[in-house]
Amino acid sequence: MTWLGHACFLVQMDGLNLLTDPVWSDRCSPISWLGPSRYRKPPCKLSELPQIDVVLISHNHYDHLDLFTIRWLGNSPIYIVPDGHRAWFNKLKIHRVIEMKWWDSYSISPIVKIGCLPAQHWSKRTTFDDMKALWSGWGVFGSKKLFFAGDTGYCQGFEQIGDKYGPFDLALIPIGAYEPRDFMRCQHVDPIEAVQIHQDIGSKQSIGMHWGTWVLTDEHVYEPPQKLAQELASRNLDPTCFFALHHGATYHTDWKEEIPTVLETLVSDLDALPQRATSSGF
């Protein structure tokens, strides 16, 4: 499991290489010269990735679905996407696309099944396509159970996911892009709500994502892992049950030694950093 920034992970399990929400462009914007520029560059080149078997897309916002990256990956992987995304891929002459609605599933191999799971968010890529495509999280069910939350606000759907498919061995949960709360609450969880998701789905361990790659909202770029640690402490939870990785760091799920978190190395640097720059029942 390697964090490649924002919501992008390289997941290697059961003989498959999966990518989640891959974005290698500098700006997450419909215009190449306008919009948020990266705070951190990708930790590797696209050409340095292993052969990718499956790409999971959570929704069509530009920080999660990137034209440049998808064009580079081409028709080699299978793309698993929420309902309403197939036409976008087909325009790129990419046809290995599996669309799903919430609670649908698809067997990607004899031992791995992908499930489309609820999230609370929205979709929009142009002026004319508000809410025309679905958004989702994903479950990967094989020798281990993985949950990828995608982009989401907090909702009761996570209790449903936990009741139906928990516990999960590992969860990838957003912890950043949450201020101001009165505007962002319905679409982006904060670290407090992220910990609640961790508990709702019965995650044994979780990794924080959706932070530190672009400065998209008002909180300090390195605040999310601090607030995450504070929330775990306030609930008397083991700090190793939910942690943040360095960009480009790899975490082995069976590794029981020290976990490479970012909090210790970042707290002392904060003052020097800019504040802002198939069917159900699978």
Where are these regions (language model features)?
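Short active-site oxyanion
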Residues: L73-Y79, K145-L146
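Divalent metal-coordination and catalytic microenvironments
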Residues: V11, D21, H59, D66, ...
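Active-site metal-binding loops of divalent metal-dependent hydrolases
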Residues: P22-W24, H59-N60, A119-Q120, G150-T152, ...
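Helix-loop-beta element that forms the nucleotide-linked donor phosphate-binding surface
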Residues: F89-K101
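Catalytic core of the metallo-beta-lactamase
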Residues: H6-D14, I108-D169, R185, V189-E193
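Pre-active-site segment of Zn-dependent metallo-hydrolases
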Residues: L4, C8-N60, L67-W72, G84, ...
